[in-house]
């Protein structure tokens, strides 16, 4: 491991048990949990609240630490740093989900944990499975996917963000 990046994410569910996911705008347009990098001198909990607000417009609080996931391996031949991701369970205190970081996120939508969209980041996949199983305090190493499937561009842009949130 040549370098390590620290990041945060959160599993946020609605009253129906659906999980809020973000679709990345760049690269393979992977689905992921809301979150981002931890800034210098910032606590993981503060970073999670800040990043969720910046990406989704939601005010949240962290309920518990779902786990710490170390993302390792190369992605499609790229030499990327390992990522140490603190993943929390979070509850919404206020606001309506909306894309607040259009340069980073193309859309937000709620998904049933049994019918998750693809392609998805391996960390999100593992964390959602752990959340559904009722686990907390998980310590897990997760390998990057070598070749994520690419969504069809027409399908990826067909659904408007507001319609996706209404599901």
Kindly label every feature range from the protein language model.
Residues 99-133, 164:
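NUDIX/MutT-family hydrolases
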Residues 129-167:
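Charged phosphate-binding loop/patch that engages nucleotide di/tri-phosphates or the phosphate backbone
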Residues 1-19, 37:
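Conserved N-terminal beta-strand and adjoining loop/helix that marks the start
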């Amino acid at each position: 491991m040549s370098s390590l990046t620290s990041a945060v994410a959160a599993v946020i569910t609605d009253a129906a048990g659906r999980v809020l996911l973000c679709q990345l705008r760049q690269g393979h347009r992977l689905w992921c949990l809301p979150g981002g990098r931890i800034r210098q001198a910032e606590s993981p909990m503060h970073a999670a609240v800040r990043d969720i607000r910046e990406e989704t417009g939601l005010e949240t609080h962290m309920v518990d630490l779902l786990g710490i996931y170390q993302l390792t391996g190369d992605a499609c031949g790229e030499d990327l740093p390992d990522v140490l991701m603190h993943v929390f369970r979070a509850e919404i205190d206020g606001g309506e989900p909306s894309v607040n970081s259009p340069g980073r996120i193309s859309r937000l939508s709620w998904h049933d944990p049994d019918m998750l969209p693809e392609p998805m980041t391996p960390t999100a996949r593992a964390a959602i499975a752990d959340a559904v199983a009722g686990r907390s305090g998980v310590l897990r190493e997760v390998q990057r996917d070598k070749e994520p499937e690419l969504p069809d561009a027409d399908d990826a842009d067909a659904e408007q963000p507001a319609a996706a949130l209404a599901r």
